[in-house]
Amino acid sequence: MEIVNALGRRKTAVARVYVREGSGKILINQRSLESYFPSSILRYVVKQPLNKLGVSEQYDITINLKGGGYKGQSEAIRLGIARALIKINSKDKPLLRSEGFVTRDSRKVERKKPGRPKARKKFQFSKR
């Protein structure tokens, strides 16, 4: 099997995912998954598509990450891994879609508007 690549995005995080047959190693920006994401919850999010299909020990995954925070990055990786697994075996798509791993979460931070302190917050209104 050759290398399969896919792209995952979430908020401002962009994850380029490269999947090849191997023993289950995950490298993020040349660092191990455990050193990049100290939180077990974020590591769980990254591995969700692999665990759902039961293939966590079959593939080596290399990821280039840019932008965003830890949460956005982990969810971008999850989307990228799910897309790569679908490229490898398209029969897995319904199972991954039912778990919500294939859907791109398009929510982003709303921009600040002029004349307001934040995007939707307004300055205190004084009637008199």
Curated annotation (Swiss-Prot):
The keyword NAD does not apply. Residues 106-128 are annotated as: Disordered. This is Small ribosomal subunit protein uS9. Keywords: Ribonucleoprotein, Ribosomal protein. Signal peptide: none annotated. GO terms for molecular function: RNA binding; structural constituent of ribosome. GO terms for cellular component: cytosolic small ribosomal subunit. GO terms for biological process: translation. InterPro entries: Ribosomal_Su5_D2-typ_SF (IPR020568), Ribosomal_uS9 (IPR000754), Ribosomal_uS9_bac/plastid (IPR023035), Ribosomal_uS9_CS (IPR020574), Ribsml_uS5_D2-typ_fold_subgr (IPR014721). Disulfide bonds: none annotated. It comes from the Bacteria. Residues 109-128 have a biased composition (Basic residues). It comes from Azobacteroides pseudotrichonymphae genomovar. CFP2. Belongs to the universal ribosomal protein uS9 family.
